[in-house]
């Protein structure tokens, strides 16, 4: 295995470990992993459409829709009708913000501590590098992905 392949494998495994960490955190918090991501997406205080959340957080639209229905029934999200277009934007209600804080408190603390520990060893530029790498990987995979029906 050449050096690039070794580095790519380490990056792939690192991102999978991070995903796994969130998965196990969600299980411990007794929420679905995609609900945790949805709360994270909405916790920035800005309105978002279901399509935006599906695209930005890489969650299937049907899963976003199902989770939104559950959160709406629990009183945690509300739809806004003031945005242009036919799709309504979502926001957390006051109860939803309290629920998100309760579910995510330990997660945010863990993330901050992990970032602080990382910044003790590495430059903050690692975030830009990781973001750029993610953009490049997605772009290259998109260019090379087989189309449906290709064999």
Language model feature labels by segment:
Residues 1, 121-151:
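C-terminal regulatory/oligomerization modules of transcriptional regulators
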Residues 20-63:
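N-terminal helix-turn-helix DNA-binding core of bacterial DNA-binding proteins
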Residues 1-29, 98:
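N-terminal leader segment of winged-helix/HTH proteins
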Residues 3-6, 10, 56, 63, ...:
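Alpha-helical initiation/capping and key positions within long helical/coiled-coil segments
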